[in-house]
Amino acid sequence: PDCGRCDLKYPRWLPILKPELQENVSLLRLIQKQDRYIHVPFHSFDYYIRVLQEAALSKDVKSIKTTLYRLAKDSKVVKALICAARNGKKVTVVIELLARFDEASNIDWSKKMQDAGIHVIFGVEGLKVHSKITHIGMKTGSDIACISTGNFHEGNARMYTDYMLMTASRSVVREVNSVFTFIEKPYSPVHFKELLVSPNEMKLRFIRLINDEIKNRQSGRPAYIRVKVNHI
């Protein structure tokens, strides 16, 4: 709350800029060369927005797929996706209408995206699509994926600590695309090696990983578990 007294406020904190991701470089090319990591709010969420904006205008990009859970009131993310669709890219958006407190906003954004020619998928019956992933299809085949623990939401990215990996790793990118295949064709037999995807295999694989560390400890080998979770 703002009580009107400057002496009761913390100094305004600004995100750290990453020198290798400055304005005069192609982020798509940088990601294709090496994985990039963003930790918001300590790093700027604008890097992700720049990736979408560049993809929307690039002649090398043929498609963009993304999941959306919560959106900012004046979402630059959606604006970039609409720009991409108007520039002839095939854009697919999976939007979760059951995002608590944001149902009405998500419906409004869905209509705007559909009007722009974006293929909008309203989740999967019986499941809630909570993942935050983006797949950018390149004409050269050097596709890119973004995997985030937080919403693609400019406001959230200024308050919540979240992690985002932007990668061109073929195995990871392929599996991110498989998640969209599963969403578009619900309950199709899709298996994952690189990603932990619920409700398919996540719980069983987590338990197996925990049991592995228990066995390591019992055998006198180094063992540890470090995990960051939002809810159990």
For each of these PLM feature ranges, what is it?
Residues 1-223:
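N-terminal localization/anchoring segments of enzymes in phospholipid and broader phosphate metabolism
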Residues 41, 228-231:
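Structural motif
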